[in-house]
C-alpha cells in the first residue's frame, strides 16, 4: 500500500496492521480452501516463483512416500534450514506441513476428477494409510474425502443440469 506524505503515525500503524491481517487471511485460505490458487497470495515476484518451484517439485515427486524436507531441500539445491525458514516465512507452515498440504490439495484435484477410488488416491499422493489420509483430510478441510467426493459430484450434477 502506498502512503502519501505527510502521514500520521496512527494511520501508518493502521495500514501495517491491515496488511498483516490480510496476508494472514490469505495464508489461512490457502491452507483451508482446496482450490485457493497460489497466485492469489500476496508475494513479490521472486517469492512467488520460489513457491511455484517448491509446489511443482513436490507435485513431481508426490507419489514418493519418502519425500521429506531433506530430500526436497536437496532437489531444490538449498540447505534444510534455508528451506525451512523460507517456507515458514511465505506460507506460515513448516515444510513438513507444507508438503502434506500440497499432497492433500492434489488429492482434492484427483477426487474432483472422479476417475479414481479414494483408497487409490491416498497412495497416488504419497500417503500409505487410507485411514491416516482420511484423518489428515478431515483435519485440513473439515470434511472426509468421501464427503468431499459426494459434494463434488453434487456440484457437477448441478452444473450439468439444464436450466
Regions found by a protein language model. Name each.
Residues 69-99, 122-147:
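Basic/polar phosphate-binding segments, predominantly the helix-turn-helix DNA-binding elements
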Residues 55-67, 87, 91, 108-117, ...:
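Basic, amphipathic alpha-helical hairpins
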Residues 16-24:
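Short, hydrophobic alpha-helical segments
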Residues 23-53:
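CheY-like receiver
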Amino acid at each position: 500500500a502506498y502512503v502519501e506524505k505527510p502521514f500520521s503515525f496512527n494511520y501508518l500503524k493502521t495500514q501495517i496492521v491491515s496488511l498483516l491481517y490480510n496476508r494472514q487471511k490469505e495464508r489461512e485460505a490457502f491452507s483451508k480452501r482446496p482450490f485457493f490458487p497460489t497466485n492469489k497470495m500476496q508475494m513479490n515476484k521472486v517469492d512467488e516463483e520460489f513457491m511455484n518451484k517448491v509446489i511443482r517439485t513436490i507435485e513431481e515427486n508426490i507419489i514418493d512416500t519418502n519425500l521429506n524436507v531433506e530430500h526436497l531441500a536437496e532437489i531444490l539445491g538449498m540447505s534444510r534450514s534455508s528451506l525451512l525458514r523460507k517456507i515458514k516465512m511465505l506460507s506460515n507452515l513448516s515444510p513438513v506441513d507444507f508438503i502434506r498440504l500440497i499432497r492433500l490439495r492434489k488429492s482434492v484435484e484427483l477426487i474432483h476428477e472422479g476417475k479414481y477410488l479414494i483408497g487409490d488416491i491416498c497412495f497416488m499422493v504419497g500417503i500409505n494409510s487410507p485411514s491416516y489420509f482420511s484423518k489428515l483430510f478431515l483435519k485440513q478441510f473439515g470434511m472426509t474425502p468421501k464427503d468431499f467426493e459426494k459434494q463434488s459430484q453434487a456440484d457437477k450434477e448441478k452444473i450439468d443440469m439444464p436450466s
